């Protein structure tokens, strides 16, 4: 009986996790669609100074990201 209870609890957790993942997918799709911005649109927002953490070049004022914004030159 205990094994059946544990099995039912595990199944409930798996189903609830799957439901949460399905709710997040529309937001991910919006993020994917918004990544197609031009450089001018990207520069409208604040850019990071030298030595600030970054994940891509367009986040830095220098447009040079190597885990941190670096200075060109």
From Swiss-Prot:
Belongs to the conotoxin O2 superfamily. GO terms for molecular function: ion channel inhibitor activity; toxin activity. Keywords: Amidation, Cleavage on pair of basic residues, Disulfide bond, Knottin, Neurotoxin, Pyrrolidone carboxylic acid, Secreted, Signal, Toxin. The modification Isoleucine amide is found at residue 72. One of its GO terms (cellular component) is extracellular region. The modification Pyrrolidone carboxylic acid is found at residue 46. The presence of a 'disulfide through disulfide knot' structurally defines this protein as a knottin. Pfam families: Conotoxin. It is found in: Secreted. Disulfide bonds join 47-61, 54-65, 60-69. Residues 20-41 form a propeptide. Coiled coil: none annotated. Residues 1-19 form the signal peptide. This is Conotoxin MaI51. InterPro entries: Conotoxin. Expressed by the venom duct.
């Amino acid at each position: 009986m205990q094994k059946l209870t544990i099995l039912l609890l595990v199944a409930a957790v798996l189903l609830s996790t799957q439901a949460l993942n399905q709710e997040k997918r529309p937001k991910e799709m919006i993020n994917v669609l918004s990544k197609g911005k031009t450089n001018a649109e990207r520069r409208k927002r604040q850019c990071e100074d030298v030595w600030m953490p970054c994940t891509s070049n367009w986040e830095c004022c220098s447009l040079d990201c190597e885990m941190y914004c670096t200075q060109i030159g």
